Amino acid sequence: MPDAGTPVGHGDVTQRVGVEVIRARGVDVEKLIKMLIANAAAEFASTYYYYTILRMHLAGYEDYKEICEDARLEDRAHWELIVPRIYELGGELPNDLPEFHNQAGCIAAKLPNPPTVVNILTVLLESERCAIRSWSAICVMTFGKDPRTYDMAARILNEEVEHEAWFIELLAHERDGKSIPSGHFRRGEPGEAPYSKNRRFYNP
């Protein structure tokens, strides 16, 4: 029987088979929980919140605002996807927002000074790159060992890679006058998150 060496006592609520199985396969569960909390903090506290401010300051660039809005809302969807997994693994979120913010795996995407469109796009781009590195690390850690966390991380990573491509395209055009196409598919609705919400793709 697969993973028969990870028994949990009948009616025991202090252990989780879903945790012991992946631990037996070599996952450092405590480290994984810390990484997921850091990524959750990055998606919510240092990205979703600050992207809201960045979007407001893309004045006069309605097309850029729309793309920023997709990234902003999809990062919120990522947050919603991560949190249940943290608790399933036996972890929990800090009961203090500043403490949670300080655990973020990426620096806060704060409004730059001066808040020019080029500076804002640069902040957005570097924020997405940090997210790609963070989720890639979790994919490597869980591949072949923890299919549930791996599937979640891979779905989020797919969208972060798209976000990076969007902001490369916009920044190259705005700052360098170059065309570096992202292959951007317009979302059917803002923040559709086709990977993390398992929705169909819409390509007009």
Language-model features: locations:
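Iron-associated oxidoreductase/ferritin-like identity signal
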Residues: M1-P204
